[in-house]
Amino acid sequence: MPIQILPPQLANQIAAGEVVERPASVVKELVENSLDAGATRIDIDIERGGAKLIRIRDNGCGISKDDLALALARHATSKISSLEDLEAILSMGFRGEALASISSVSRLILTSRTAEQSEAWQAYAEGRDMAVTIKPAAHPVGSTLEVLDLFYNTPARRKFMRTEKTEFGHIDEVVRRIALARFDVAINLNHNGKLIRQYRAAPDPAQHERRLASICGPAFLQHALAIAWQHGDLNIHGWVADPAASHTLSEMQYCYVNNRMMRDRLINHAIRQAYQDRLNDAQQPAYVLYLDIDPHQVDVNVHPAKHEVRFHQARLVHDFIYQAVTAVLQQTNAPILNISEEGEVDAPRWQQENRVAAGTNKYAQPEAAKSSAAEQAVARERSSARERAAPAYKEDHPYQKQQGELYRQLLQPSAAAKPATSPAAIPASSVSSPSIPVQRITQAEEPLHGDNYSFGRVLTVFPPCYALIEYQGGVALLSLAVAERWLKQAQLSPPEEGLRPQPLLIPLKITLDKNEIAACQNHEKLLITMGIELSVEQGRATLRAVSLPLRQQNLQKLIPELLGYLSQHEEISPDTLATWLARHLGSEHEVWNVSQAIQLLTEVERLCPQLVQSPPAGLLQPIDIKAALATLTHE
């Protein structure tokens, strides 16, 4: 058979195989469209488990007559209009496939009216033909979608549908998940003419527990621990269940990313790791959690049904969730359902025109619309004692720089609270010996500018680890390995409160000898200061967390060597240990390239400015370019 372009009807039915798995999939897509339209009330009518009728009625903004036929066309949407919109999705839908796919396997009736129209209009499309017929109708402002005889023209798909009770059970679960995502929307679910679920709107956070109890049951409400945790652009809130009640609540697992319901493996793994010492293998944690993240840093376009996402900083998100859940579970006196008493969230002060109904992208607002520093300070004071505040996302800073600052704040949690140090206040004295810590710049400080605090431009790299740079009007060779070692030493020199431990994805089991076990016990406080969480039981050690600079190292080899070094010293300072670690860490690059060299020198200039003014031995070797020129000119 020669290659040919598929007819539109066949292409839509193929797409329907991904989008429309069962009646519950139709309900999910249509209800999400209603939410994107700004609806505050949604009525759902189901007959025969969705096989005969699915009707969704809302009071959203509606669809104009001119757009009605286009709404049923494939790849037609009001949610996005450019690649920039796709990379910062906040609306539930964006592909423009759902209505076209549904109409290709059913008889679909769409009735809608906008506030500007004096009358409503109705569009009808059926099966393979998909010709859209439009006629006047009576309808209030909003939309009603009726899907009749689902899969009537695809017998194979209809044959795989389960019993009426089973299919409605899946619909009920979808509605429950959506109701947990949008407390501000009233949702009614009817089956065969009977009211099955009625979720009243609860815009006030103080009323959220009412809906939580109606969906998850009083048992979950009784054992729920409130969680509210923030760091930089990451925010997580919701409830986790007391591990003691997990055996009765194993089915209660609801997770949302930017209010989009998810079944993401990374999130589930982080939560499971937080519960690992409190549950046996047969038990499952119970939770209702909401993760808010800059939409630029999460890709929702990776799953046909949008059940999974891909995070650009997956490790950071995993560790953030792990720490948040662990902190709540470790608080023995954690208050139950400590819901904020503040009222409704104020209406957004700015929105893009195509996002009015879909929601606010707080990460792309103009500077004038953002809270002042004073307002943010007041908000932090009012927040829960468990909430961790961090500087707001700034659009004029590249995100990778923001992410680097965020990692450094995780590494040194108090740095962001310290006053910034001006470049003029940085001492220009010669660099101390490696046993003395390199002075660290606070995270609030801007990058240093000018020749006094810059090595110069990287011209090229000589493998494996030497960079040719412009230096003080000439050129010089710089050892990237030595620069990396000094940077590691600066990162490992702990502040007064110690380095922040970063949980490992999987705890590491290490076999130790008697001397290493003794060293672990004698230097327990020092290890904690260095961000290393190591517990010893019956001759075996379990490594649960290390500081950020150690995350990429071969810990199975490094930790025994570290304990062997500690066993030779009764007293040792954190700075001395940081120096030892810096000399024993493996390099992140066997062979360097120009971009890696530039990134390294940028970090060194930021954290170790003294190395620029007084390079230590072995770091920099100026090249006598004048002598070479003289040779070439025969002078």
From Swiss-Prot:
InterPro entries: DNA_mismatch_repair_CS, DNA_mismatch_repair_MutL, DNA_mismatch_S5_2-like, HATPase_C_sf, MutL/Mlh/PMS, MutL/Mlh/Pms-like, MutL_C, MutL_C_dimsub. GO terms for molecular function: ATP binding; ATP hydrolysis activity; ATP-dependent DNA damage sensor activity; mismatched DNA binding. Residues 364-377 have a biased composition (Low complexity). The keyword ATP-binding does not apply. GO terms for cellular component: mismatch repair complex. Residues 359-399 are annotated as: Disordered. One of its GO terms (biological process) is mismatch repair. Residues 378-399 have a biased composition (Basic and acidic residues). Pfam families: DNA_mis_repair (PF01119), HATPase_c_3 (PF13589), MutL_C (PF08676). The keyword DNA damage applies. Keywords: DNA damage, DNA repair. It comes from the Bacteria. Belongs to the DNA mismatch repair MutL/HexB family. This protein is involved in the repair of mismatches in DNA. It is required for dam-dependent methyl-directed DNA mismatch repair. May act as a 'molecular matchmaker', a protein that promotes the formation of a stable complex between two or more DNA-binding proteins in an ATP-dependent manner without itself being part of a final effector complex. PANTHER family: DNA MISMATCH REPAIR PROTEIN MLH, PMS, MUTL, DNA MISMATCH REPAIR PROTEIN MLH1. This is DNA mismatch repair protein MutL. It comes from Yersinia pestis.
